[in-house]
Design a protein with these regions (language model features):
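N-terminal, active-site-proximal structural segment of metallo-dependent hydrolase catalytic domains
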Residues: 1-109, 116-118, 140-159, 169, ...
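Core residues of folded domains in eukaryotic genome-function proteins
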Residues: 10-17, 46-51, 105-107, 120, ...
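Conserved beta-strand elements of beta-rich interaction domains across eukaryotes
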Residues: 21-24, 57-60, 78, 99-104, ...
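Short coil/turn segments at secondary-structure boundaries
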Residues: 28-33, 64-68, 122-126, 184-187, ...
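Amphipathic alpha-helical scaffolding segments
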Residues: 33-38, 68-79, 125-136, 187-189, ...
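Metal-dependent phosphoester-hydrolase catalytic domains
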Residues: 89, 128, 154-156, 162-163, ...
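Eukaryotic regulatory low-complexity N-terminal regions enriched in Ser/Thr, Pro, acidic
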Residues: 117-119, 126-127, 134, 162
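His/acidic metal-ligating clusters that form di-metal
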Residues: 181, 208-230
């Protein structure tokens, strides 16, 4: 979640939310009301004027059985009292599961407040902006809808997976004459903890990086490109091998295997003093004796490395919240992690460097701030931001930054952005 606070008549507070809702639709009668309540409470608390909600795995694993719940979910959001003042709505739901070569199960939902005028959306076929008025819900087969761009990643990007729904769904907006893009993305997961333990970057990390670079090249090659916010389920995982090495420094390892079946092999790490099992790693098991505490400690962020190679192109606000995955899908254990994967920050909100120029900082940005690591002093101190009028995406020549932009960047704002979890103490599914 990311919010830019309003500072003047031409500044707009935005709420950007990403949520993998697959597990919610597995238990819709229990979990959908909780998720919806937490989301609407966040809207009421923050009072944004533009909401961008990006969903992944809409409908869950059995989409054909969940379509009615998806329709009810959309209807509930559109008609709820909390969103009654959001009179301009655009919804894109990729629901055509009968077309596996194109199906992504992505959903982009946008809500604009009645006070937000001069709002337009880009038509990728007309190559121009069109006015946004009223409510428009695009669902089912949305291939011919021209105010969005959707792409499924080539299968060779994820050779370890026989079938995948991963891809991106993109829209471009003009919000009070500021051009900006919102890109929903879903990247491939780690299929096996044992394979993920190979030296960083693992085969899974390399596949995700390949797909993300493919997406960024596509965005930057567009002659009409605008600064973008790309947020979704990146499936970024901590360096599993590095984490295991860290937590097993004083332990003894042994491998258990059932005959020649490597799929059932398991690594156990035991205490030398009392032979107690401290860590167990198998294909779909990652279990530590102190599981609910140890992976919330600050040291884990050192192993959150998947953005390293892309930091010159993408910016992220300081992450000061616990790993977003994998949480128990149990309403009685809303803050507990499942013992299936190493907890990781899968769900992220990232910005292009040109989008960062839309935000006002309390000090002049420089290369040290743009490319510094998450643990640097500059990232640790909360900078303040607001949305300002932008230039187009790309690399502006030196000296071409407008006087207005220089003035806005030089002056501090009065309020801060927020980057964190919605429903941190509620059961929001396996992702938060």
């Amino acid at each position: 979640m990311l919010k830019f606070k309003k500072m003047g008549s031409d500044k707009v507070p935005l709420l950007l939310v990403t949520a993998n809702v697959g597990s919610i639709f597995e238990e819709p009668t229990t979990m959908l009301p909780i998720w919806t309540s937490e989301f609407l409470a966040a809207v009421a608390r923050m009072d944004p004027k533009f909401i961008a909600l990006h969903l992944q795995e809409v409908g869950g694993k059995t989409y054909e059985k969940s379509m009615q719940y998806v329709r009810d979910f959309v209807q509930r959001l559109c008609d709820c009292p909390e969103l009654r003042l959001y009179d301009k709505i655009r919804i894109y739901l990729d629901e055509d599961f009968s077309s596996p070569e194109k199906f992504t199960a992505l959903g982009n939902m946008y809500f604009a407040h009645s006070t937000l005028t001069d709002l337009k959306i880009w038509d990728f076929e007309l190559k121009s902006y069109v006015d946004v008025v009223g409510r428009e819900v695009n669902s089912g087969n949305i291939e011919k809808v021209t105010t969005k761009e959707k792409a499924k990643f080539p299968q060779q990007f994820f050779p370890e997976c026989k079938w995948s729904r991963k891809g991106f769904l993109r829209t471009r907006w003009s919000i009070r004459n500021t051009a900006v893009e919102f890109v929903n993305i879903h990247l491939f997961h780690d299929a096996s903890n044992l394979l993920a333990m190979e030296p960083f970057p693992s085969v899974y990390c390399r596949s995700r990086r390949r797909a993300l670079r493919h997406t960024l090249r596509h965005l930057h090659s567009d002659v009409n490109a605008a600064p973008y916010f790309i947020f979704g389920d990146f499936n970024f995982r901590t360096d599993t091998g590095g984490v295991v090495k860290k937590v097993t420094e004083e332990l003894t390892a042994c491998r258990l295997q059932n005959g020649t079946n490597t799929e059932s092999s398991k690594l156990q790490f035991r205490s030398k003093s009392d032979d107690r099992i401290v860590l167990t790693v198998a294909k779909k098991e990652f279990s530590h004796v102190d599981h609910q505490k140890i992976f919330r400690e600050p040291w884990l962020q050192r192993f959150d490395r998947e953005l390293e190679a892309l930091r010159p192109h993408l910016y992220e606000f300081p992450v000061k919240f616990p790993p977003t995955y994998p949480f128990e899908e149990d309403i009685h254990l809303p803050t507990h992690y499942m013992k299936t994967r190493c907890p990781s920050w899968c769900d992220r909100v990232l910005l292009s460097q040109s989008a960062r120029l839309l935000l006002q900082h309390n000090e002049r940005p420089d290369n040290r701030h743009l490319h510094s690591s998450r643990n640097s002093d500059s990232d640790a101190s909360p900078n303040r931001r607001k949305l300002v009028r932008n230039q187009s995406e790309g690399s502006p020549k030196s000296g071409e930054t407008s006087a207005e932009l220089r003035r806005l960047v030089d002056h501090p704002t009065r309020r801060r952005s927020e980057y964190g979890m919605i429903g941190d103490t509620a059961c929001m599914g396996d992702h938060k």
